[in-house]
């Protein structure tokens, strides 16, 4: 059951799951992009945005959030049943930034959700186009992964902040479907499961009755998704144990944390896709590009080519560095928050620095921030090379990593060794080898101890020139091994607050 995800490409998960050939998949993904682009153009018209304002990433985020909110049925139901003061459950909105008399002004807009849904459906040939919505959710998730470190969330569930490389997709909404599940990291799945088990421990009725049956099947489904991410038999067997537990409790939480730690060395397979902001798709569609006809893939050269020819702007706070803001967004566009920085620097063609060294805060501007001192600048989102996104964790080996992040989760299928700090990881595995899962634990620890520093992952895979669309001449990069490979190194990134 768990392996079915590995047999379908994500483009198929992104579509309706039936097997399609490459051309059909490319057309189908292209159609989704067309829909987002058409919707964005229409929204810019509604809001009377100039071309420059329409290419402002903050405006894009507001418009994306509005349509996601308009289609969030569960939350909409909840808002109608629990009316809160000053919040109209039928409306959605946010800040739109306009250039007035040489200054940036913030304007709070409010729309009927019904109206937004109508515009979205119209842009998508009458469909709800859930795939396009999920695509935008993944873009927001990738941006969060690049901007914030989930230290608090990790500590709250009893995990270690150094495991942040396992947390891809930790802010994705639950309704993000199969495409969303594919991009979630091992740590994210473990955290969701631990939260569930803790609720069960604290609330006697959580697993009982009609609702309890639904809860139970959600629990088993999540266990299976996590199992499908693991690449070794022992890790998978451990997930079977957790899934089959009659009454999940602390033993299961222990097993889950153990399996998450083991994933720092025995990495799980996590999908990566380049999801771009709507303000990239809009202008491309407006210029007459037909994504459905031309075909599009989230895991090949297409997003790189699109970014080479796109102009995106961002608001910049007084003490922020525009180049650093560009790096943040570039990494988010390629789902590369947990990739090795040496490789990212090579692909991008400019040095990619750890989060703590960047003079930039998040992309979104809070409502209480002063607009008088806001400037805007062009985001540099181009790259020197392109590479194929991976959904495997790569095989394992070792190199000294840092205090902040002690492993990577590869984004690109490119030959290199994968840094992780073996001594730090292994130090966490003292003690507990008794209990039902003892043989699996012993086996997992043995495999981790056998992981060799000199082993190369993705052997023979390289990056490609942007002119090499068919990926015929791989260029295998060589790295300076003395350089720091982790993005959240000894980090001081802000916390993500929901």
From Swiss-Prot:
Q: In what way is this protein post-translationally modified?
A: Late in virus-infected cells, may be cleaved from a 56-kDa protein to a 53-kDa protein by a cellular caspase. This cleavage might be a marker for the onset of apoptosis in infected cells or have a specific function in virus host interaction.
Per the UniProt entry, what are the Gene Ontology biological process annotations, in alphabetical order?
A: symbiont entry into host cell; viral penetration into host nucleus
Gene Ontology terms: cellular component = helical viral capsid; host cell; host cell nucleus; ribonucleoprotein complex; viral nucleocapsid
The protein's GO terms of the molecular function aspect are:
RNA binding; structural molecule activity
Q: Where is this region: Disordered?
A: 1-21
Q: Keywords on this record?
A: Capsid protein, Helical capsid protein, Host nucleus, Host-virus interaction, Ribonucleoprotein, RNA-binding, Viral nucleoprotein, Viral penetration into host nucleus, Virion, Virus entry into host cell
Q: Where is the composition biased (Basic and acidic residues)?
A: 8-21
| Cysteine-cysteine disulfides | none
Residue ranges annotated as motif Unconventional nuclear localization signal? 1-18
Localization per Swiss-Prot or TrEMBL: Virion; Host nucleus
Q: Where is this motif: Bipartite nuclear localization signal?
A: 198-216
Give the family per the record. Answer: Belongs to the influenza viruses nucleoprotein family.
What is the recorded function of this protein according to its Swiss-Prot or TrEMBL entry?
Encapsidates the negative strand viral RNA, protecting it from nucleases. The encapsidated genomic RNA is termed the ribonucleoprotein (RNP) and serves as template for transcription and replication. The RNP needs to be localized in the host nucleus to start an infectious cycle, but is too large to diffuse through the nuclear pore complex. NP comprises at least 2 nuclear localization signals that are responsible for the active RNP import into the nucleus through cellular importin alpha/beta pathway.
Q: Which HAMAP family match?
A: INFV_NCAP
Summarize subunit and interaction data from the UniProt record for this chain.
Homomultimerizes to form the nucleocapsid. May bind host exportin-1/XPO1. Binds to viral genomic RNA. Protein-RNA contacts are mediated by a combination of electrostatic interactions between positively charged residues and the phosphate backbone and planar interactions between aromatic side chains and bases.
What protein name is recorded for this chain? Nucleoprotein
Source species, please?
A: Influenza A virus (strain A/California/10/1978 H1N1)
The protein's gene is named NP
């Amino acid at each position: 059951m768990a392996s079915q995800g590995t047999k379908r490409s994500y483009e198929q998960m992104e579509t309706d799951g039936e097997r399609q050939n490459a051309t059909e998949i490319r057309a189908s993904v292209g159609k989704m992009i067309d829909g987002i682009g058409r919707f964005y153009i229409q929204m810019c018209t509604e809001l009377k945005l100039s071309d420059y304002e329409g290419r402002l990433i903050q405006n894009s985020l507001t418009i994306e959030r509005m349509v996601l909110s308009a289609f969030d049925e569960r939350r909409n139901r909840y808002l109608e049943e629990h009316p809160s003061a000053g919040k109209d459950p039928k409306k959605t909105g946010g800040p739109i930034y306009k250039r007035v008399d040489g200054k940036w002004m913030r304007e709070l807009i409010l729309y009927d959700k019904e109206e937004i849904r109508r515009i979205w459906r119209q842009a998508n040939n009458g469909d709800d186009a859930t795939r396009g919505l999920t695509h935008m959710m993944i873009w927001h998730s990738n941006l969060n992964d690049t901007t914030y470190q989930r230290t608090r969330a990790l500590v709250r569930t009893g995990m270690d902040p150094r495991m942040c490389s396992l947390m891809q997709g930790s802010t994705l909404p639950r309704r993000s479907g199969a495409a969303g599940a594919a991009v979630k990291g091992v740590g994210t799945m473990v955290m969701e499961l631990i939260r569930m088990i803790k609720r069960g421990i604290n609330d006697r009725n959580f697993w009982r009755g009609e609702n309890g049956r639904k809860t139970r099947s959600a629990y088993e489904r999540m266990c299976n998704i996590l199992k499908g991410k693991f690449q070794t038999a022992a890790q998978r067997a451990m997930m079977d144990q957790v899934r089959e537990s009659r009454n999940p409790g602390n033993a299961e939480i222990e097993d889950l944390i153990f399996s998450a730690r083991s994933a720092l060395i025995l990495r799980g397979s996590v999908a990566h896709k380049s999801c771009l902001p709507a303000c990239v798709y809009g202008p491309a569609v407006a210029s007459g590009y037909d994504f459905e006809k031309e075909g599009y893939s989230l895991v090949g050269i297409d997003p790189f080519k699109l970014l080479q020819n796109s102009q995106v702007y961002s608001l910049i706070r007084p003490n922020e560095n525009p180049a650093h803001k560009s790096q943040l967004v570039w990494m988010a566009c390629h789902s590369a928050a947990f990739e090795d920085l040496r490789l990212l620097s090579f692909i991008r063609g400019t040095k990619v620095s750890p989060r703590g060294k960047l003079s930039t805060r998040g992309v979104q501007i809070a409502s209480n921030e002063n607009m008088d001192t806001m400037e805007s600048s062009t985001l540099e989102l181009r790259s020197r090379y392109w590479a194929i996104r991976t959904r495997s964790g790569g095989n394992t080996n070792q190199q000294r990593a840092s205090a902040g992040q002690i492993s990577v989760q590869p984004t690109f299928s490119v030959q290199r060794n994968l840094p992780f700090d073996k001594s730090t990881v292994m130090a966490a595995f003292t003690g507990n080898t008794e209990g039902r899962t003892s043989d699996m634990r012993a086996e997992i620890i043995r495999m981790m101890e056998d992981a060799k520093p000199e082993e190369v992952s993705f052997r023979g895979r390289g990056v490609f020139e942007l002119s090499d669309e068919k990926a015929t001449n791989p260029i295998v990069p060589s790295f300076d091994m003395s350089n720091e490979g982790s993005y959240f190194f000894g980090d001081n990134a802000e916390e993500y607050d929901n």
